[in-house]
């Protein structure tokens, strides 16, 4: 059958179309493998957030279904960079890796290099790749990762760079293969895109508008995961609190959580990220009454100054954020709160910075991701006046980091001497007679154990707090 006949014979409906192209690519991969006398390998390098990590599991699932074996490094036959573009230097990292790969490809001209993810959604980036990195074979974006097999087939046939970047889509393709990193826990996308347009953030421009999956599809996926041995799921979205608003039959995130809670065999439910402006009383009540939702909430602050929050377009004030924390603590006194904070946003004064420090002292976070403001081309904040001098930002960042770490080391101690449930995740990276796991509140615990414990929830005595983690002992 000719190439044209194969494409003409492809189903038009998804996911049948992609299943068809996976089969076609598999024939090509098997033929190449026979020629080389070894299996063709693939390697995915993932940059950025948990949404990207989950996307990479889907991409790897497609590649393995299409006949590739997973390789260990960039010397593989098919190398894919799933990119992040939240910060400008994330782009520079990828350009650096592409420069390195040009040498690798000279030695192995049959290898293929692909780029996808948020960085690919920027037209100027795609133009630069096409001009300066001609050894790249495949470029696609965030909206059409499900089309990898079809695009790969096109590249095999055309033998030239394939570019397929969509500006936006409402399409969500279900039931494609996924290769999970962990057999006992999994991320689950419940929605895609973002409608918030924070003035410093590129995400709505590269991930598109909010699109929610149907609750039935989410439940079906989680039931399948549980049947396959998963005990913990992480529900993922740029702003999970907005889930369900754009569905034909609207549903709240709290209602979705209550449905997920009913799935037999599922032990733990996590979710991220929550936008403070959309955190409802219904959600707080659902968390309070749940036996499965973990005792942890990531609630990005970004700044403690109401003036800076206004410029960031965050749509809440310092006072509203603190009132929300008060509600959460009243409902769940033991809840672990973590956050994101940006230092040095344009126009931030010393007084604004002290407002942030004040919130940190009042909330007492278990941990915080702290960032120096990074001017992001294409966002309103990049053009704002009063960009802060580097030395001032560095000084504030160091002061904030010390405050966060000092408080966190005190807060984490609160369970010292108690026995808690721990989901064991892996062999300890520093001591192979120990294992590492997490409490419901996401704190890491190290204790003596072996691989037979991985994936199990066990009782552990938290013997000693060591800053951000515990040393413990298994309760037999």
Region roles according to the model:
Residues 198, 218, 235, 271, ...:
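Conserved, mostly hydrophobic/aromatic
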Residues 2, 383-476:
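Terminal RNA-binding accessory module
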């Amino acid at each position: 059958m000719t190439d044209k006949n194969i494409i003409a014979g492809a189903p038009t409906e998804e996911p049948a179309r992609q299943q068809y192209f996976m089969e076609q690519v598999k024939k090509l991969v098997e033929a190449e493998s026979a020629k080389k006398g070894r299996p063709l390998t693939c390697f995915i390098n993932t940059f950025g957030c948990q949404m990207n990590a989950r996307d990479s599991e889907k991409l790897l699932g497609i590649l393995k279904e299409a006949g590739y074996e997973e390789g260990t490094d960039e010397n593989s036959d098919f190398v894919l960079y799933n990119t992040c573009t939240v910060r400008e230097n994330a782009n520079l990292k990828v350009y650096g890796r592409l420069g390195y790969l040009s040498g690798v490809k000279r030695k192995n001209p049959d290898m293929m290099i692909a780029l996808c993810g948020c960085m690919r959604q920027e037209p100027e980036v795609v133009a630069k790749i096409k001009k300066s990195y001609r050894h790249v074979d495949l470029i696609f974006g965030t909206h059409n990762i499900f089309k990898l097999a079809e695009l790969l087939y096109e590249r095999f046939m055309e033998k030239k760079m394939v570019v397929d970047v969509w500006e936006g889509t409402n399409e969500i393709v279900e039931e494609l293969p996924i290769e999970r990193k962990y057999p006992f826990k999994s991320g689950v996308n419940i929605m895609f895109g973002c409608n918030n347009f924070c003035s410093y953030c590129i995400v709505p421009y590269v991930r598109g508008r909010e699109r929610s999956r149907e609750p039935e599809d989410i439940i079906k996926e989680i039931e399948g995961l549980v049947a396959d041995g998963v005990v913990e799921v992480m529900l993922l979205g740029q702003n999970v609190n907005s889930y369900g608003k754009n569905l034909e039959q609207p549903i709240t995130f709290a209602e979705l959580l209550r449905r997920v809670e009913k799935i037999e065999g599922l032990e733990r439910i996590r979710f991220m990220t929550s936008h403070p402006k959309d955190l409802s009383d219904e959600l707080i009540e659902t968390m309070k009454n749940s036996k499965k939702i973990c005792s942890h909430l990531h609630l990005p602050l970004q700044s403690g100054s109401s003036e800076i929050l206004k410029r960031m377009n965050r749509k809440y004030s310092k006072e509203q954020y603190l009132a929300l924390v008060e509600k959460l603590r009243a409902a769940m006194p033991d809840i672990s709160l973590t956050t994101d904070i940006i230092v040095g946003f344009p126009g931030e004064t010393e007084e604004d910075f002290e407002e942030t420090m004040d919130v940190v002292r009042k909330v007492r976070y278990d941990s915080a991701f702290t960032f120096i403001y990074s001017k992001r081309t294409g966002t309103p904040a990049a053009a704002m006046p009063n960009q802060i001098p580097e030395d001032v930002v560095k000084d504030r960042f160091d002061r904030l980091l010390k405050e966060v770490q000092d408080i966190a080391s005190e807060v984490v101690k609160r369970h010292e001497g108690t026995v808690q449930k721990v989901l064991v995740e892996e062999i300890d990276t520093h001591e192979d007679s120990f294992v590492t796991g997490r409490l419901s509140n996401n704190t890491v615990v190290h204790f003596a154990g072996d691989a037979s414990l991985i994936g199990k929830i066990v009782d552990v005595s938290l013997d000693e707090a060591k800053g951000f983690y515990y040393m413990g002992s298994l309760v037999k």
